[in-house]
Amino acid sequence: EILAPFLKDDGKLTLAQFRHNDGSLKEERSIFWARVSERLMQRLTEQSDYFGEVANIELDPPLLSPPQHEQFDMVLTFRNAHIWNESGHLYGTLQSIFQALKPGGVLGMVEHRSARLSDISSSAVEGYLDEAYVIAAAERAGFQLLQSSEINANPKDTKDYPKGVYALPPTLAMGLTDRDYYLAIGESDRMTLKFTKPARAAAD
């Protein structure tokens, strides 16, 4: 709703969609996200006057399909890294993104931030990721950190809830239990990171 109209007349937006369900998906979570992608693609078609021409590729972590080689000036990802990490594909997905970016291109990342500063990763239960861990994974994939911001920080997020980050809005996984408490905290504390693919580097 923001990027598509902004790029409609001067640029091009490509969405990395969840894997299409061709009947082979068995995992409930994958089937759910395939439906989300289908609804989004239908909306883009129905409201093409507003969104313009939006391209679609598939991201089935860690791979983009079709493979992308130095195609993009910028890649943005919002609260996806913990999902990639939980399936063991954080580093591999970052490698695919690195390959897809043009030299000098930018990766922007927003992610739920854990309270720790260490080399540990996230667990599927909590949904948070350690900022140092994310930066290290991106640098290992070839990126250089340009800047970090506290624009999405939330000091009220204590990160110790029974269902992890999913207890907070918008998910509110605890249902009616302590709902007002979680609404008062608001959405999660998040890292906001800006990386670049060095101009001298070329994708393999």
Regions found by a protein language model. Give the residues of each.
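Conserved beta-strand signature within the Rossmann-like core of class I S-adenosyl-L-methionine
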Residues: 13-16, 104-112
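A short beta-strand submotif of the Rossmann-like class I SAM-dependent methyltransferase core
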Residues: 74-80, 86
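S-adenosyl-L-methionine
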Residues: 28-64
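Core SAM-dependent methyltransferase catalytic element
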Residues: 158-204
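Short, glycine-/aromatic-enriched active-site segment of Class I SAM-dependent methyltransferases
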Residues: 108-124
